[in-house]
């Protein structure tokens, strides 16, 4: 999980808790889901946290949560946004692979080294998490005073404008960060360490994403910014731009940054994003609304709460809430833009629980006393396994994943053939390996693969397995039906149908079931040496001597007899 470094003194100052000791602060942070991992060489706290709360990737976000926890703040405080003075114009030449952009201006900052480090850390942590290592969203932070914009928007309104467009890889030059030479974008990918790291994100594009002002190219997203607009401790006004593959993602990343800089006293100024056919005003700091029922909150947490208490707890979580008492008691909950983790009413219930204090919840024994025990199926499985071992079989546990070649081709079957009552195998959409493309529909092919891999060992080899098999069944909620299958093989120079049947009948006797073996045909077995397994009048499997074609496919030089049947056929 992500680890964030936080200056404890900075955290105390922002959260207005200067009197808190380190131990008290660590306990309060743990209550927020932030676990203390240690201290850096500079004395900063290293905090690990669940990656759902991305607004806590910076000291400003953590301090905000502590202020709510201590009651210093309540409800939602949306930073004021001044009217747009700048426009990002999106040109038609922008690569289709990265078509979206957003931005904001932040003025009046007074960044020292600690604050600048916090901003850089927030940028990089957002890249690593929500931005999917810059693939889904990348952030550029620039010194606004170094930009020169001009022109007007497509709607005719005057504006200082920069342009997001495509650039030829060997086209315009700029000086990238941490460099002193002008380079084309292609040269950046070849010669700059950051270009080598993130070059794969634009690999194969005819035109690379680029951002221009009136002076020229100053940003090559998602790879690197130009040195002309580099931010340092003397910078007071920032221009923030984000590009990506999804508008919602980069807008939410921008909201998290704007809230963090607003906590530093920054004044947010909107930016118009001109797509030609539409113009967006960003940042989008508007709230969203979700509804949660009072009954759901009480049932999930196991506590009785008054409606006013729930509203109070939600406001202490940084949310706004209004109770609706008409009919079932529900709450209309407003969620700030930086809370990208609130996707479902369950997330709101979690906030109520944390504000209430999970340590305050009192465990209670259930009204109905129950005694745990093993499932009957598990008991049966163990009993059959012990019986197989007693009959001389070696117990195996094979992979449930296999390939259609192993299931069908090497067993002399076509996909339409019936292998022990199996249905069509469940297939893997994007298999990691061609050896594991389907879930097995019967277990005998797995045992033959083991025999194939052990031809160098002495015979006899008597192997058995009780394992899961599956088939497509559209009547099931998952479209897949699973059951446990019992399979065994006898491999030796004198292996025969009679050897396998004797073991099968011994299993039937041990469990008090009537097993009959009427003759049948099966492509995997020798004609006339194959039978169906019928248990208490119900077809359950197959038994026989494996066909020479199957033995040759598996490089086996001794006869093999085998059987397979459904485990649940032995149940009472």
UniProtKB/Swiss-Prot annotation:
Belongs to the phenylalanyl-tRNA synthetase beta subunit family. Type 2 subfamily. The keyword Translocase does not apply. Its cofactor is Mg(2+). It is found in: Cytoplasm. GO terms for biological process: phenylalanyl-tRNA aminoacylation. Residues 285-363 form the B5 domain. The keyword Oxidoreductase does not apply. This is Phenylalanine--tRNA ligase beta subunit. Keywords: Aminoacyl-tRNA synthetase, ATP-binding, Cytoplasm, Ligase, Magnesium, Metal-binding, Nucleotide-binding, Protein biosynthesis. Tetramer of two alpha and two beta subunits. Mg(2+) binds at residues 341, 347, 350-351. It comes from the Archaea. One of its GO terms (molecular function) is phenylalanine-tRNA ligase activity. It catalyses: tRNA(Phe) + L-phenylalanine + ATP = L-phenylalanyl-tRNA(Phe) + AMP + diphosphate + H(+). It holds the Pfam family tRNA_synthFbeta. Its main location: cytoplasm. It comes from Natronomonas pharaonis (strain ATCC 35678 / DSM 2160 / CIP 103997 / JCM 8858 / NBRC 14720 / NCIMB 2260 / Gabara). The gene is pheT. InterPro entries: aa-tRNA-synth_II/BPL/LPL, B3/B4_tRNA-bd, DNA-bd_dom_put_sf, Phe-tRNA-ligase_IIc_bsu, Phe-tRNA-synth_IIc_bsu_arc_euk, Phe-tRNA_synthase-like_B3/B4, Phe_tRNA_ligase_beta2_arc, PheRS_beta_core. Its EC number is 6.1.1.20. One of its GO terms (cellular component) is phenylalanine-tRNA ligase complex.
């Amino acid at each position: 999980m992500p680890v964030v470094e936080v200056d404890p003194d900075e955290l105390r100052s922002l959260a207005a808790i200067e009197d808190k000791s380190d131990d008290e602060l660590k306990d309060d942070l743990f209550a927020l889901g932030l676990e203390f991992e240690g201290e850096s060489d500079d004395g900063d706290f290293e905090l690990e946290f669940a990656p759902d709360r991305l607004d806590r990737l910076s000291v400003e976000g953590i301090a905000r949560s502590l202020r709510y926890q201590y009651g210093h703040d309540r409800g939602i405080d949306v930073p004021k946004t001044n009217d747009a003075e700048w426009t990002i114009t999106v040109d038609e030449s922008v690569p289709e692979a990265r078509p979206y952009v957003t931005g904001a201006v932040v003025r009046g900052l007074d960044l020292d080294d600690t604050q600048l480090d916090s901003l850089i850390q927030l940028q990089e942590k957002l890249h690593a998490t929500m931005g999917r290592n810059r693939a889904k969203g990348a952030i550029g932070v620039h010194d606004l005073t170094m930009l020169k914009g001009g022109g007007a928007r497509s709607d005719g309104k005057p504006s200082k404008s920069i342009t997001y467009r495509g650039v030829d890889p060997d086209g315009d030059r700029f000086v990238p960060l941490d460099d002193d030479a002008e380079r084309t974008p292609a040269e950046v990918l070849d010669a700059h360490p950051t270009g080598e790291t993130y070059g794969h994100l634009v690999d194969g594009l005819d035109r690379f994403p680029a951002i221009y002002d009136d002076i020229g190219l100053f940003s090559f997203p998602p790879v690197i910014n130009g040195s002309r607009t580099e931010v340092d401790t003397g910078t007071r006004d920032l221009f923030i731009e984000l590009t990506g593959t999804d508008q919602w993602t980069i807008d939410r990343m921008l909201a998290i940054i704007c809230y963090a800089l607003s906590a530093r006293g920054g004044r947010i100024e909107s930016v118009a994003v001109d797509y030609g056919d539409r113009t967006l005003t960003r940042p989008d700091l508007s709230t969203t609304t979700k509804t949660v029922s009072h009954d759901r909150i009480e049932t999930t947490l196991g506590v009785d709460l008054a409606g006013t208490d729930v509203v109070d707890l939600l406001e202490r979580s940084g949310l706004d809430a209004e109770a609706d008492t008409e009919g079932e008691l529900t709450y209309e909950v407003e969620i700030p833009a930086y809370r990208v983790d609130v996707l479902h009413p369950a997330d709101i219930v979690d906030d109520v629980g944390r504000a209430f204090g999970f340590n305050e919840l009192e465990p209670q024994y259930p009204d109905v006393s129950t005694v745990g025990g093993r499932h009957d199926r598990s008991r049966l499985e163990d009993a059959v396994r012990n019986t197989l071992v007693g009959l001389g079989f070696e117990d195996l546990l094979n992979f449930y994943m296999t390939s259609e070649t192993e299931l069908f081709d090497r067993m002399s079957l076509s996909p339409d053939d019936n292998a022990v009552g199996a249905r069509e195998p469940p297939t893997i959409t994007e298999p990691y390996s061609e050896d594991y493309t389907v879930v097995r529909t019967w277990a005998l092919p797995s045992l033959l693969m083991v025999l194939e891999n052990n031809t160098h060992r002495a015979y006899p080899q008597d192997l058995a397995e009780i394992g899961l098999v599956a088939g497509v069944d559209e009547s099931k909620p998952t479209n897949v039906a699973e059951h446990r299958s019992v399979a065994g093989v006898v491999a030796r120079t004198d292996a025969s149908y009679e050897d396998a049947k004797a073991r099968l009948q011994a299993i039937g006797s041990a469990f008090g079931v009537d097993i009959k073996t009427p003759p049948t045909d099966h492509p995997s077995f020798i004609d006339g040496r194959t039978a169906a397994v019928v248990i208490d009048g119900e077809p359950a499997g197959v038994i026989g001597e494996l066909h020479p074609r199957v033995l040759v496919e598996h490089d086996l030089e001794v006869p093999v007899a085998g059987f397979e049947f459904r485990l649940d056929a032995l149940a009472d």
